[in-house]
Swiss-Prot record:
One of its GO terms (molecular function) is XTP diphosphatase activity. Homodimer. Disulfide bonds: none annotated. Substrate binds at S16, H17, N18, R19, G20, K21, S78, F161, G162, Y163, D164, K184, H189, R190. It catalyses: XTP + H2O = XMP + diphosphate + H(+); dITP + H2O = dIMP + diphosphate + H(+); ITP + H2O = IMP + diphosphate + H(+). NCBIfam families: RdgB/HAM1 family non-canonical purine NTP pyrophosphatase. This is dITP/XTP pyrophosphatase. One of its GO terms (cellular component) is cytosol. Gene3D superfamilies: 3.90.950.10. Mg(2+) binds at E48, D77. It comes from Rhodospirillum centenum (strain ATCC 51521 / SW).
Length: 203
């Protein structure tokens, strides 16, 4: 079995145009990387997500950014998996928000579809985060993290982004969007994925 490739250097492109996500990733990697140019800052195009899995889409985005920038790049593909909706919105979580990235509308769609499903699995859900670290030569290291919880409506809290206001992680009474950001970083699906990535490529 080939040993994982280690990151070496002080600059890592964050292959995202989502400012909230870029900020969260930079916070999680601040002890290991000095510079975090984003895909938006480098004016890199957003590749179409054509893969069928979170890891597939993360790898696609990371490779595209690494090739375009000539630097190592990290991409995240994350989403909300609702048990009663057979995993939807899943890899289409961002698309449910539309081109305007209206997650208020996306959360309302989840609520409506959950109501219509009337499934015995109820409001159980999980957030999934796949991380892919790519180099300009095309090599990719990838991991996947999860956080289990329940959905709540109406949305609560203003500290998060995406579907954070409707997701209550197991063991908590608050939504992701009501939690202190440092606490959310410690328990989130992204934190789970980052713990794996740090052990694999940065330790």
């Amino acid at each position: 079995m080939t040993a994982p490739r280690r990151f070496a250097g002080d600059t890592l492109v964050i292959a995202s145009h989502n400012r909230g996500k870029v900020r969260e990733i930079a916070d999680l990697l601040a002890a290991h990387v000095r510079h975090f140019p984003s895909a938006a800052e480098l004016d890199l195009p957003e590749p179409e997500e054509t893969e069928a899995t979170f890891i597939g889409n993360a790898a696609l985005k990371a490779r595209a950014a690494a090739l375009a920038s000539g630097l190592p790049a990290l991409a995240d593909d994350s989403g909300l998996w609702v048990d009663a909706l057979d995993g939807a919105p899943g890899i289409y979580s961002a698309r449910w928000a539309g081109p305007e990235k209206d997650f208020g509308a996306a959360m309302e769609r989840v609520r409506r579809e959950l109501e219509a499903a009337a499934d015995r699995r109820g409001d159980r859900a999980r957030f999934v985060c796949a991380l892919a670290l790519a180099w300009p030569d095309g090599h990719v290291e990838a991991v996947e993290g999860t956080a289990h919880g329940t959905l709540t409506f109406p949305p609560r809290g203003g500290k998060g982004f995406g579907y954070d206001p409707v997701f209550i992680p197991d063991g908590h009474a608050c939504t992701y969007a009501e939690l202190d950001p440092a606490h959310k970083h410690a328990i989130s699906h992204r934190a789970d994925a980052f713990r794996q990535l740090l052990a694999r490529c940065f330790a």
